[in-house]
Structure formats: C-alpha cells, structure tokens
C-alpha cells in the first residue's frame, strides 16, 4: 500500500480479529499506584519474555497489540502487555497519567521482570507512543539496558510536526478519534484530578 491513510485505516477494519487469551495482574508501583499487566504465557516456563507497549489510549483490546501478542506466543515467547496509567480496565488511584517522555513505569517494570526472571531473555516492542517511550528508555539506559532486544514500530519521533499534520486535511480524522478517546479516558478519571483540574464532565466533553 502506497497511501499512508489506507495503510493506517484498513487494518483497523479488515485485519482478522485475534482472540488471544490472557490473564490480568495489578503490579503496585513505588508511588502507591499500580500498573495493569496482561499476560499471555506458553507452556514452557523458561520461554523468553517480550513486553508489548501500546499506543496513545490503546490497551489489550487494540488490534495491533493482540496481533503481536498472538504472533509472539505462536513463536514460543511469553508475552506481557503493560498498560499505561488509566488505559487499563480499572481507573488508577493517583492523578498521574502518562506521556511519551515518561519512562519511569517502564523502567520499574523491566527491573521487576529482571529480578523475577533473572535467567530469561527479555525483549520489548513498542507501538506509536509506546514506541516513543521505549526508544527514550533505550537511550537513557544505553549499555546498562537489561533488554536483550527491542523494536520500535511507527513511533512519531517528532511529536510537534506530527501534531501539526493531524490538524490538517484527512489528519483531522485521527485527531478526532484520539481526542474522543482521551476525553472518555479523562472523564472516568475526574474524581482523582478534580483538585488539580477543576473541570466538569460537560466542559470536558466540549473540548475540541
């Protein structure tokens, strides 16, 4: 496909749905919150482990995430998707959210995995915003990185210019889709952030 919009939109509607089995786990974080993890494990208890990072407002139900998890498990990998805060099935406890430059939760989680599975290779793959987070983490860790391998998929390296693009022409389709998802996500977070951001649900949903 040579058209970037067709390449982006078609898989959303025509890619086969992957019904991947998984188990959810809540991992408590040092600041008193939690990270929700979706585990998909093979029968081999010593299988190499791959961490999957979703994109902006994605989650375990994102088609690209499930597709990657199914493909990796088929190859014998243990797979775990790390939800960014407030992208999970339950609302996080703290007002803190996530962004493309925040690597703290990823670093904490990978260190946790390294302690839990000291002899198993650990890899990571990040999509879109998750790719931004992963790339920044790799740059921060450099030669001390505990990962054996990593892949960054479709990450908007220049976020400023990418933001400008989605404000124009067909890009507005993506802007509306992402903004609607972000507003719904923030709406369920209102009780936690009302002191920091005094906004009503009605005001929030009118943001465009």
Language-model-detected regions and their locations in the chain:
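N-terminal cap/lid segment of alpha/beta-hydrolase-fold proteins
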Residues: 3-44
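Short beta-strand element of the alpha/beta-hydrolase
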Residues: 47-55
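Short substrate-entry loop that stabilizes the transition state in hydrolases
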Residues: 56-63, 73, 88
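Short amphipathic alpha-helix adjacent to the substrate-entry channel of hydrolases
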Residues: 64-81
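Catalytic nucleophile-loop/oxyanion-hole region of alpha/beta-hydrolase
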Residues: 71, 85-123
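Short beta-to-alpha linker loops that shape the active-site pocket of alpha/beta-hydrolase fold enzymes
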Residues: 78, 83-87, 156
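Alpha/beta-hydrolase-fold enzymes
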Residues: 115-208
């Amino acid at each position: 496909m040579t058209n970037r919009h067709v390449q982006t939109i078609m898989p959303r509607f025509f890619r086969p749905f992957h019904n991947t089995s998984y188990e959810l786990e809540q991992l408590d974080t040092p600041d008193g919150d939690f990270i929700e993890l979706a585990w998909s494990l093979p029968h081999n208890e010593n299988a190499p482990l791959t961490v999957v990072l979703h994109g902006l407002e994605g989650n375990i139900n994102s088609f690209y995430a499930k597709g990657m998890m199914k493909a990796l498990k088929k190859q014998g990998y243990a797979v775990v998707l790390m939800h960014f805060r407030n992208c999970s099935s339950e609302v996080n406890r703290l007002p803190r959210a996530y962004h493309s430059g925040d690597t703290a939760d990823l670093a904490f989680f990978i260190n946790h995995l390294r302690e839990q599975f000291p002899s198993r290779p650990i890899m990571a793959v990040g999509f879109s915003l998750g790719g931004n987070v992963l790339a920044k983490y790799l740059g921060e860790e450099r030669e001390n990185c505990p990962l054996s391998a990593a892949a960054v998929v479709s990450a908007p390296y220049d976020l400023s210019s990418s933001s400008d693009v989605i404000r124009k022409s067909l890009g507005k389709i993506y802007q509306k889709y992402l903004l609607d998802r972000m507003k719904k996500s923030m709406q369920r977070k209102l009780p936690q952030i009302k002191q920091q951001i005094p906004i009503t649900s009605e005001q929030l949903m009118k943001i465009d």
